[in-house]
């Protein structure tokens, strides 16, 4: 059996640019791409925490160290500057890979979209 699993996530990153007339895509700081194991032209899902919008596009490289998250083309209509978004990518994984300990790459950022930490799992949610 093959499963569609979370492969990469950049959590609560702020939108820095919205370029309506740029060729469609999402430019992401190269440091964030590498940390999250997302490659150029890979399909990504973007979930806007501020307004609930959910959409798909593809990743392109943004200037390294800039903190850039630029929504381009029609995606620019889905967010405003400063909105917090989650960027995710998925992979098809077989049972053997899962049993071998396959894990996602989860990246967490500070208020300037700089990497502050990473994990390979989402903690168990508790009732509190």
From Swiss-Prot:
The modification Pyruvic acid (Ser) is found at residue 25. GO terms for molecular function: aspartate 1-decarboxylase activity. It is found in: Cytoplasm. The active site is at 25 (schiff-base intermediate with substrate), 58 (proton donor). Its main location: cytoplasm. Its EC number is 4.1.1.11. Binds 1 pyruvoyl group covalently per subunit. GO terms for biological process: alanine biosynthetic process; pantothenate biosynthetic process. Its cofactor is pyruvate. Substrate binds at residues 57, 73-75. GO terms for cellular component: cytosol. Gene3D superfamilies: 2.40.40.20. It comes from the Bacteria. Pathway: Cofactor biosynthesis; (R)-pantothenate biosynthesis; beta-alanine from L-aspartate: step 1/1. It is an enzyme of class 4 (lyase). Is synthesized initially as an inactive proenzyme, which is activated by self-cleavage at a specific serine bond to produce a beta-subunit with a hydroxyl group at its C-terminus and an alpha-subunit with a pyruvoyl group at its N-terminus. It catalyses: L-aspartate + H(+) = beta-alanine + CO2. Transmembrane segments: none annotated. CDD domains: Asp_decarbox (cd06919). Keywords: Autocatalytic cleavage, Cytoplasm, Decarboxylase, Lyase, Pantothenate biosynthesis, Pyruvate, Schiff base, Zymogen. Belongs to the PanD family. Heterooctamer of four alpha and four beta subunits. PANTHER family: ASPARTATE 1-DECARBOXYLASE. Catalyzes the pyruvoyl-dependent decarboxylation of aspartate to produce beta-alanine. This is Aspartate 1-decarboxylase. It comes from Paraburkholderia xenovorans (strain LB400). The lineage of its organism: Bacteria, Pseudomonadati, Pseudomonadota, Betaproteobacteria, Burkholderiales.
